[in-house]
Amino acid sequence: AVGYALQYKDSTTRMRQGTYTNHAMELFTNDNARITIANDGHVVLSNSIAFRNETTADNRLDDYEEGVHTQAPVNANLTLTNNILRYTKIGRLVTVSGILKPSAVSSSNAVQITLPFTSVADSGNTCGRYTSALMHKFVNIDDSYRNVVGYIGQNEAYWRIYHVGDNLDWHQLTNNDLSTNTEIFFTFTYHTTD
């Protein structure tokens, strides 16, 4: 028969067996706490989650985070209002969404806006690049182009916007293409190294 004991941790002793109130429960292996169930019910793991028979660390889920990031222009002469974007990070996969809304704009600097995490450095056959459809108003799209798209390159901590068109090379959007009436909504999903 397999023996077991229900134990919990209190402020004076390491482990106790029996009834408990307002104390965390911990599961130990090799004398190390591996799983903690707090008195409010949330669970803390000391390592990561492995699905099925997965043993490779790269294939384990070890991170989940939700938060906000204050967007900032990489280049000068662009000031943003409503500059908070929301993000969710699950493992190395990040999804961000927000609005780009200038409050002051001048010059011909390229429009580049910070991200909460740097994209993965990826080249060769995998060539990780990420794009976003953009809902926009009051953006000056060059007459020879059709639309604009959001873009995150490899190993970059910012996103940018490109003009796209039929049988034309990409052309990066600049501050001159925006105004204080501009609004651009975006959502990106990209990989990071963290």
What residues fall within each predicted segment?
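Generic beta-strand structural signal
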Residues: 10, 37, 89, 152-154
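Self-maturation zones of extracellular/virion spikes and adhesins
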Residues: 1-34, 44-68, 73-77, 134, ...
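Short, surface-exposed beta-strand-loop junctions and turns on beta-sheet-rich folds
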Residues: 24, 33-34, 100-104, 167-169
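Structured beta-strand segments within beta-sheet-rich domains
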Residues: 20, 140-178
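Extracellular/surface recognition and adhesion modules
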Residues: 17, 27, 37, 61, ...
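Short, structured beta-strand segments at or near domain termini in extracellular proteins/domains
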Residues: 180-194
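Surface-exposed ligand/attachment interfaces on beta-rich extracellular proteins
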Residues: 56-60, 67-90, 99-123, 170-182
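Terminal beta-strand-rich extracellular "head" domains
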Residues: 99-155
